[in-house]
Protein backbone atom coordinates (compact mmCIF):
# COMPACT_ATOMS: atom_id res chain seq x y z
CA UNK A 1 0.00 0.00 0.00
CA UNK A 2 1.43 3.36 -1.02
CA UNK A 3 1.75 6.00 1.66
CA UNK A 4 -0.29 9.17 1.33
CA UNK A 5 1.74 12.13 0.08
CA UNK A 6 1.25 15.88 0.36
CA UNK A 7 2.72 18.77 -1.62
CA UNK A 8 4.06 21.67 0.45
CA UNK A 9 4.83 25.03 -1.22
CA UNK A 10 6.53 28.04 0.38
CA UNK A 11 4.27 31.02 -0.42
CA UNK A 12 5.66 33.72 1.90
CA UNK A 13 9.18 34.91 2.60
CA UNK A 14 10.97 33.77 5.75
CA UNK A 15 12.51 37.23 6.23
CA UNK A 16 11.51 38.58 9.62
CA UNK A 17 10.39 35.22 11.01
CA UNK A 18 11.75 33.40 14.04
CA UNK A 19 14.92 31.38 13.57
CA UNK A 20 13.10 28.21 14.62
CA UNK A 21 10.52 28.78 11.87
CA UNK A 22 13.28 29.26 9.30
CA UNK A 23 14.88 26.03 10.49
CA UNK A 24 11.55 24.24 10.15
CA UNK A 25 11.15 25.49 6.57
CA UNK A 26 14.63 24.17 5.77
CA UNK A 27 13.73 20.89 7.47
CA UNK A 28 10.78 20.57 5.10
CA UNK A 29 13.22 20.99 2.20
CA UNK A 30 11.99 24.40 1.07
CA UNK A 31 14.48 27.07 0.02
CA UNK A 32 12.84 29.99 -1.77
CA UNK A 33 9.35 31.30 -2.48
CA UNK A 34 7.29 28.97 -4.71
CA UNK A 35 9.62 26.04 -4.07
CA UNK A 36 7.68 22.81 -3.51
CA UNK A 37 8.32 19.38 -2.06
CA UNK A 38 6.25 16.23 -2.10
CA UNK A 39 6.46 14.66 1.36
CA UNK A 40 5.03 11.57 3.02
CA UNK A 41 2.05 12.51 5.21
CA UNK A 42 3.32 11.63 8.70
CA UNK A 43 2.52 13.16 12.10
CA UNK A 44 6.03 14.64 12.20
CA UNK A 45 5.62 16.41 8.87
CA UNK A 46 2.11 17.57 9.82
CA UNK A 47 3.52 19.09 13.02
CA UNK A 48 6.17 20.98 11.08
CA UNK A 49 3.52 22.26 8.66
CA UNK A 50 1.30 23.34 11.56
CA UNK A 51 4.19 25.36 13.03
CA UNK A 52 4.81 27.32 9.83
CA UNK A 53 1.32 27.17 8.36
CA UNK A 54 1.27 30.92 7.75
CA UNK A 55 4.23 30.56 5.36
CA UNK A 56 3.20 27.48 3.33
CA UNK A 57 0.32 26.06 1.36
CA UNK A 58 -0.51 22.36 1.41
CA UNK A 59 -2.27 20.21 -1.19
CA UNK A 60 -2.57 16.52 -1.94
CA UNK A 61 0.10 15.19 -4.26
Curated annotation (Swiss-Prot):
UniProt GO BP? translation
Q: Sorted alphabetically, which SUPFAM superfamilies does this protein's record hold? A: Ribosomal protein L30p/L7e
Please indicate which superkingdom the organism of origin belongs to: Bacteria
- Mention any Pfam family matching this sequence: Ribosomal_L30
Q: Which InterPro entries match?
A: Ribo_uL30_ferredoxin-like_sf, Ribosomal_uL30_bac-type, Ribosomal_uL30_CS, Ribosomal_uL30_ferredoxin-like
Single GO term (MF)? structural constituent of ribosome
Q: Return the GO cellular component terms, semicolon-separated.
A: cytosolic large ribosomal subunit
Keywords attached to this Swiss-Prot or TrEMBL record, sorted alphabetically, are:
Ribonucleoprotein, Ribosomal protein
Xref: CDD domains: Ribosomal_L30 (cd01658)
Stated family:
Belongs to the universal ribosomal protein uL30 family.
Q: Give the record's subunit note.
A: Part of the 50S ribosomal subunit.
> What's the protein name?
Large ribosomal subunit protein uL30
User: What organism is listed for this UniProt entry?
Assistant: Bordetella pertussis (strain Tohama I / ATCC BAA-589 / NCTC 13251)
Gene transcribed to yield this protein? rpmD
Amino acid sequence: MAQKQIKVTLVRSVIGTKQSHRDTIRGLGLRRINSSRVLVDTPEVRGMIHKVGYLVSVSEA
